[in-house]
Amino acid sequence: MRGSGPRGAGRRRPPSGGGDTPITPASLAGCYSAPRRAPLWTCLLLCAALRTLLASPSNEVNLLDSRTVMGDLGWIAFPKNGWEEIGEVDENYAPIHTYQVCKVMEQNQNNWLLTSWISNEGASRIFIELKFTLRDCNSLPGGLGTCKETFNMYYFESDDQNGRNIKENQYIKIDTIAADESFTELDLGDRVMKLNTEVRDVGPLSKKGFYLAFQDVGACIALVSVRVYYKKCPSVVRHLAVFPDTITGADSSQLLEVSGSCVNHSVTDEPPKMHCSAEGEWLVPIGKCMCKAGYEEKNGTCQVCRPGFFKASPHIQSCGKCPPHSYTHEEASTSCVCEKDYFRRESDPPTMACTRPPSAPRNAISNVNETSVFLEWIPPADTGGRKDVSYYIACKKCNSHAGVCEECGGHVRYLPRQSGLKNTSVMMVDLLAHTNYTFEIEAVNGVSDLSPGARQYVSVNVTTNQAAPSPVTNVKKGKIAKNSISLSWQEPDRPNGIILEYEIKYFEKDQETSYTIIKSKETTITAEGLKPASVYVFQIRARTAAGYGVFSRRFEFETTPVFAASSDQSQIPVIAVSVTVGVILLAVVIGVLLSGSCCECGCGRASSLCAVAHPSLIWRCGYSKAKQDPEEEKMHFHNGHIKLPGVRTYIDPHTYEDPNQAVHEFAKEIEASCITIERVIGAGEFGEVCSGRLKLPGKRELPVAIKTLKVGYTEKQRRDFLGEASIMGQFDHPNIIHLEGVVTKSKPVMIVTEYMENGSLDTFLKKNDGQFTVIQLVGMLRGISAGMKYLSDMGYVHRDLAARNILINSNLVCKVSDFGLSRVLEDDPEAAYTTRGGKIPIRWTAPEAIAFRKFTSASDVWSYGIVMWEVVSYGERPYWEMTNQDVIKAVEEGYRLPSPMDCPAALYQLMLDCWQKERNSRPKFDEIVNMLDKLIRNPSSLKTLVNASCRVSNLLAEHSPLGSGAYRSVGEWLEAIKMGRYTEIFMENGYSSMDAVAQVTLEDLRRLGVTLVGHQKKIMNSLQEMKVQLVNGMVPL
């Protein structure tokens, strides 16, 4: 690397003779030396120039500067008649060390100048700056054949400070140095002096120090100064973090990462780091420190908050003045103390003013209707400075004679509620008739429970009127016969007077329009003339002087059959029927034993009956596995499916006549002694799910998941349980859960699979909300799609694809599991499995599968789109709280789930493609895998997010944006989602109604100061949930 520096300029007369004597800075600087030296004005000019060059940049640390060495340099020149030192002093008598050589008339010059040992002070890369003058060979008469215009520079690394015995060939050449400008006799005549500056770097260095050497090969040169230095990034304070002096790296392109330390009274927000470049510059700052609570940033330091000011959190930039009704007399306050009779809840932000309980409600009025009372009032004059005012109703029953009151008790009902009332009205029902009551209406707010003062309430005294009795609640059956039912009951809890009679209404079930009324003064009746073996519905109500009460709830009782015996009849008819049935069954068995025709029909499904009815006839069937032809056995095992070499085809285990045969063909039997159950991790449809270890002979121990079949299972449950193993055993793919084997020869019956440490995908995502990059989420989706492609290629339909049925291991590998609802798809692309009833997971199921119960690989693609939505939303419930019927209706009308927050546009478009109504328009799983692979290979395509405003604008407009007023105020909504701290901010920025809140976007939240990602997501998700009540949240296709 060649550098150029400042060029000193001076004027002097040419020397009188000696053409081989150069004009040297040393001779020019000899202000007080021999008369043969340069004039005084020239040396003063050069000395001044040299002094201006002494200051080095702040990022350069000198290891040697010949201009500043006060004593002898200690350099060695050889041969002795080569380099010579010209020792001069400036006007301050400071030495100036200069070396010159000018052997241009002699051939084969080899003059060396060696420096003393130079310590590198830990630097691995150093720089050498040379300042020199050089005579133009053309200006030297007679020296053209021997004169040179370059010289060489070398170095030698050494830990020895006294090692001067270094051979020439041990030195390593740094470079050949040439002058940018050389001087001639014309320059001498014009009084111009030309000074060259060259810089070279050396590295990496591995020892403690080094020597420099300069070789002259026949030039006329003067070495004015030598400066050796290394570069550093100087100590600096950035973002309240101190970064120390840092020596640059050995590589010219290397960036050294340096960690900073926070200044006093500050804490780490994100660990502060910067990168030191090879040129000694600080680059790429990362992270920062923040002044801790009670301190604020000023001039790069953290200054204490003054009395009367506070700062509650490091995330707040400046100290703020204490809010109303609070104060602080201390420095470094993190909160302010409330004034007397003012309070602050723990959930109130420190920036909120201190508040007090409200005054009493005003102008309470009552309206009595028999045994119910309606109260109404107006809000208190003083709300205490809070917006969370609610009301509590205290009820007291008073004795008009003694003037004593007691609590009403639990029988009184309050509509809508007793406490937490937001409206200024309430109704009390189920009061006692002819009773004096006192109702106290108390206004409370968020700090009422913190105040030791007296309750603030208004009282209302009322007397109830005469009322009808309450409903009959406890009805018991008595004697039941084929034509009659006897019942008894207890008096109503609140008769509200003397019971005059009871009215009993009954009718045959599902024939309510034809009923019978019986009246009784007792609490028992017998209804007669009923039909045998029929269900009857009874309702009872009481009557007082005030009239009838309401009917009781419905009670159902069934009469006995015609042949059934009542409590006082004999058991003869029952015995007779039992004997008759037994005779019929015996006749059937004898008929089967006498008839061998079932075995003459070949080896169909009747063969199993043949073996049970007549074991001696098994040989006639020709179906015993021991005697079976291998080809016949093969055809039987595959039940008509032809297996081509190299082609894997799924075989439905339900087509096997003997389900156990399917299990043994596709699943490996494991000895129970090889399995160690460690703990229960869940419960399945058939029993417990455990984790444990599997140690097979000659193989390493494996962690496994173990499904067990519960005790007391039926044969059908056993078949269904092992059926899943028969399905899993046919699959071999890294994204399909792997079956290790089954245990069927001992109890409990077990299915053993690989163990997935992180469990189900939906639960895992909820636990790790927002913790993964988009690429990681796409990687999960890619694994799921690869597994589904494998199943689809085998002609297999899953039917229940959802995040809950995807398992994920510690390496974030997703695997498809849970084949309980799965069925086979034939080779015909139009074939589909028709279910035989049963539950369908509506939120994940394609519309054609819901409507016609037809399942195809295309319906699995629809379900995969829902899984994509679950993954990107970190396990949110699809369609939130919409009912299944609302989901079916919305999807049928063409609406789709909105994009999750911060969802890449490419992923949401793929979701919408999976949700095409026409199943043939949906992508195939192999196309989905290819699309996701492209996204992974090109991460920049995932940076474009679905526009938040578009997500809102695409929602249905004909419905209320907030679900028909689910919340009456912004404060109530924020409190409900535990975000009440932002109430004041919303109100101050004009979001005072729920309709205004409906238009809030993510950018609006950031502008309002909601900076925590978790809080942003909670608020946006709540808004989105409200928007999708009924079908508000669906995006039309």
From Swiss-Prot:
Q: What is the effect of changing residue 417 to Q?
A: In a lung adenocarcinoma sample; somatic mutation
Compartments in which it is found: Cell membrane; Cell projection, Axon; Cell projection, Dendrite
Enumerate the spans annotated as Protein kinase domain: 675-936
What's in the keyword line of the UniProt record?
Answer: ATP-binding, Cell membrane, Cell projection, Glycoprotein, Kinase, Membrane, Neurogenesis, Nucleotide-binding, Phosphoprotein, Receptor, Repeat, Signal, Transferase, Transmembrane, Transmembrane helix, Tyrosine-protein kinase
UniProt-listed SUPFAM superfamilies = Fibronectin type III, Galactose-binding domain-like, Protein kinase-like (PK-like), SAM/Pointed domain
PROSITE patterns this protein is in?
EGF_2 (PS01186), EPH_LBD (PS51550), FN3 (PS50853), PROTEIN_KINASE_ATP (PS00107), PROTEIN_KINASE_DOM (PS50011), PROTEIN_KINASE_TYR (PS00109), RECEPTOR_TYR_KIN_V_1 (PS00790), RECEPTOR_TYR_KIN_V_2 (PS00791)
Q: In which tissues is it expressed?
A: Almost exclusively expressed in the nervous system in cortical neurons, cerebellar Purkinje cells and pyramidal neurons within the cortex and hippocampus. Display an increasing gradient of expression from the forebrain to hindbrain and spinal cord.
- Domain of life assignment: Eukaryota
InterPro entries tied to this protein: Eph_TM, EphA5_rcpt_lig-bd, Ephrin_rcpt_lig-bd_dom, Ephrin_rcpt_TKs, FN3_dom, FN3_sf, Galactose-bd-like_sf, Ig-like_fold
Q: Name one GO cellular component term.
A: dendrite
Q: Where does ATP bind?
A: 681-689, 707
Those parts of the protein on the Extracellular side are 25-573
**Where are the Phosphotyrosine residues found in this chain?**
650, 656, 833, 982
Region Disordered, residue ranges: 1-24
Please give the Gene Ontology molecular function terms for this protein.
ATP binding; ephrin receptor activity; GPI-linked ephrin receptor activity; transmembrane-ephrin receptor activity
Q: Where is the signal peptide?
A: 1-24
The record's catalysed reaction(s) read: L-tyrosyl-[protein] + ATP = O-phospho-L-tyrosyl-[protein] + ADP + H(+)
As for membrane topology, the entry says: Single-pass type I membrane protein
Modifications the protein undergoes after translation, according to the UniProt entry: Phosphorylated. Phosphorylation is stimulated by the ligand EFNA5. Dephosphorylation upon stimulation by glucose, inhibits EPHA5 forward signaling and results in insulin secretion.
Spans within the Cytoplasmic topological domain: 595-1037
Q: What biological function has been recorded for the protein in this entry? A: Receptor tyrosine kinase which binds promiscuously GPI-anchored ephrin-A family ligands residing on adjacent cells, leading to contact-dependent bidirectional signaling into neighboring cells. The signaling pathway downstream of the receptor is referred to as forward signaling while the signaling pathway downstream of the ephrin ligand is referred to as reverse signaling. Among GPI-anchored ephrin-A ligands, EFNA5 most probably constitutes the cognate/functional ligand for EPHA5.
- Which protein family is it in? Belongs to the protein kinase superfamily. Tyr protein kinase family. Ephrin receptor subfamily.
Report the protein name in the record: Ephrin type-A receptor 5
